[in-house]
């Protein structure tokens, strides 16, 4: 298995002939509005372009997983950092089959995407000769997660590959801990940018939560969702310092945009 990190939460899993695109934010730098104006410096998103190897990888994509997309079915509130207009256009143009939560299936189909599978939490479903399980995610602490319309993570078991748990946009919850302890993924992916809007509590794990997630992870951890969005204050350097302080750095990969990891 290879993990090709593109930008923020967008990456590609390569497994044999299959190239699985995760959460396609594919637009050029500055094509989305700022996600924070007062708490953090206002800047249009994404704050960086896709890496130079992105188009070659995207040309190979065969499937797509979307952890979350819609908020109450209202298009202007779509989570553009996980599915933007360029991502939609790509999926539609190339007829890429999408797997997402059942509650998001009709929304994506309404806008022209082909949803192959709608998943229910904790129910294992056949996927590419293996299995996929949706794990509930809580997109923030306090009341804000209800406004954010929670998505999910994905636990993937593909033939002759290490298992992988993509935790998605979530804080540390009993469901996340259950996934780590019961499913025992060989690889885990955690969003560590600590996104926060101008109102409400953080939308992703705090540093302490991320460190605990990493401790609980049975195998290697990949950290993402950093250095591409103006409401994510934690960068790679800051994360490395935290990991070093907790003696966890060797357990974690922090890929640069365009970098590939082999497992």
Regions found by a protein language model. Give the residues of each.
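Active-site neighborhood of phospho(di)ester-bond hydrolases with catalytic His/Asp-centered motifs
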Residues: 21-23, 60-77, 99-102, 164-170, ...
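Cap/insert and terminal regions of metallo-dependent hydrolase folds
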Residues: 41, 46, 99, 171-257
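Active-site environment of divalent metal-dependent phosphoester hydrolases
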Residues: 27-29, 69-83, 105-108, 123-126, ...
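Catalytic core of the metallo-beta-lactamase
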Residues: 5-18, 126-186
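Metallo-beta-lactamase
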Residues: 94-161, 241-263
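Extreme N-terminal starter segment of soluble prokaryotic enzymes
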Residues: 1-3
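Pre-active-site segment of Zn-dependent metallo-hydrolases
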Residues: 18-89, 142, 172-182
């Amino acid at each position: 298995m290879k993990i090709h990190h593109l930008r923020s939460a967008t990456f590609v899993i390569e497994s044999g002939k299959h190239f699985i695109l995760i959460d396609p934010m594919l637009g050029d730098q500055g094509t989305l509005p700022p996600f924070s104006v007062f708490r953090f410096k206002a800047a249009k998103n994404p704050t960086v372009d896709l890496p130079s190897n992105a188009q070659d990888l995207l040309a190979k994509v065969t499937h797509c997983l979307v952890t979350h997309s819609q908020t109450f079915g209202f298009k202007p509130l779509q989570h553009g950092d996980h599915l933007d207009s360029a991502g939609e256009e790509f999926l539609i143009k190339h007829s890429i089959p999408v797997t997402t939560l059942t509650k998001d299936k009709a929304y994506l189909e309404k806008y022209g995407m082909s949803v192959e599978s709608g998943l229910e939490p904790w129910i294992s479903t056949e996927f590419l000769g293996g299995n996929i399980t949706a794990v509930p995610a809580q997109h923030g602490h306090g009341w804000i997660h209800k406004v954010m319309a929670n998505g999910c993570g994905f636990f993937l078991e593909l033939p002759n590959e290490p298992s992988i748990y993509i935790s998605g946009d979530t804080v540390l919850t009993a469901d996340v801990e259950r996934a780590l302890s019961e499913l025992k993924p060989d690889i885990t992916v955690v969003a560590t940018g600590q996104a926060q809007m101008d109102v409400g509590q953080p939308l992703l794990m705090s540093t302490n939560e991320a460190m605990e997630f990493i401790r609980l992870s049975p195998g290697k951890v990949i950290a993402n969702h950093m250095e591409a969005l103006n409401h994510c204050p934690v960068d790679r350097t800051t994360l490395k310092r935290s990991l070093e302080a907790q003696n966890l750095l060797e357990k974690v990969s922090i890929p640069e945009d365009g970098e590939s990891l082999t497992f």
